[in-house]
């Protein structure tokens, strides 16, 4: 249904102005950005389709259509990912990518400006925003100062859906570059499970030993999946 056919107080823009953004659903907020749908598909339907769960190929686990699994997944959509959505032309893709990038930068700035990390949950939430929507495996490191304040986050290695090659020497060099006193390791499981594998446990201990040689502590290793995160430190595995 076209927005103009909705009652005025149910149209997303007017609803936002009258009641504030918290009163709107994710799809309604997204519809304001998109502004228009396409023939046979209203903008609210288009917005909801972007937020729907992805359809995965059972053989490979890769996305084979559908949406991005919510706002967190949409945050990591590339221009190529958005291009497959019928109804998103170059102008809409550019506007959407700009807004999503601003959201990522705001989260990064907020975390950098914390006096210290409030809790493991705050770090997990930040990592979910950055990693949960990826369709390939990424290994990232949060570099911290002596007060556990964030210096930088870097994605150091990218792999397939099932494995990634992580080189301890490179992690150590980046820690020295940032003059880090501690690190939080992180990687995602695109398959959806946050349970650590034996390889995850072995990698954690290898990196912990390598970083200890340069007096850098490993505080945690966080595993991220769509809608979930697990702290290996809280499981006694660090």
From Swiss-Prot:
Pfam families cross-referenced by the UniProt entry: RadC (PF04002), UPF0758_N (PF20582)
Motif (JAMM motif): 187-200
Domain MPN: 116-238
SUPFAM superfamilies: JAB1/MPN domain, RuvA domain 2-like
Keyword terms, alphabetized: Hydrolase, Metal-binding, Metalloprotease, Protease, Zinc
GO molecular function: metal ion binding; metallopeptidase activity
GO BP: proteolysis
Binding residues annotated for Zn(2+), in chain numbering: 187, 189, 200
Keyword Zinc: yes
Record-stated family: Belongs to the UPF0758 family.
Name listed for the protein in its UniProt record: UPF0758 protein Dtpsy_2777
UniProt organism field: Acidovorax ebreus (strain TPSY)
């Amino acid at each position: 249904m076209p927005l103009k056919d909705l009652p005025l107080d149910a149209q997303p823009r007017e609803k936002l102005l009258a009641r504030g953004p918290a009163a709107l659903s994710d799809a309604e907020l997204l519809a304001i950005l998109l502004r228009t749908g396409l023939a046979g598909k209203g903008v609210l339907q288009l917005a909801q389709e972007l937020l729907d769960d992805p359809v995965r190929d059972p053989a490979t686990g890769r996305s084979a259509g559908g949406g991005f699994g919510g706002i967190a997944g949409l945050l990591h959509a590339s221009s190529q990912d958005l291009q497959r959505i019928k109804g998103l032309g170059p102008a809409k893709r550019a506007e959407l990518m700009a807004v999503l990038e601003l959201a990522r930068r705001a989260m990064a700035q907020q975390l950098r400006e914390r006096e210290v990390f409030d809790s493991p949950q705050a770090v997990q939430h930040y990592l979910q925003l950055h990693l949960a929507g990826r369709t390939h495996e990424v290994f990232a490191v949060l570099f911290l100062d002596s007060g556990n304040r964030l210096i930088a986050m870097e994605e150091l290695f990218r792999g397939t859906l099932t494995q990634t090659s992580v080189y301890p020497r490179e992690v150590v060099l980046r820690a020295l570059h940032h003059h880090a006193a501690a690190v939080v390791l992180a990687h995602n499981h695109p398959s959806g499970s946050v349970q650590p594998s034996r390889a995850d446990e072995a990698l954690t201990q290898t990196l912990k030993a390598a970083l200890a040689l340069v007096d850098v502590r490993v505080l945690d290793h966080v595993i991220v999946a769509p809608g979930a995160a697990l702290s290996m430190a809280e499981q006694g595995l660090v």
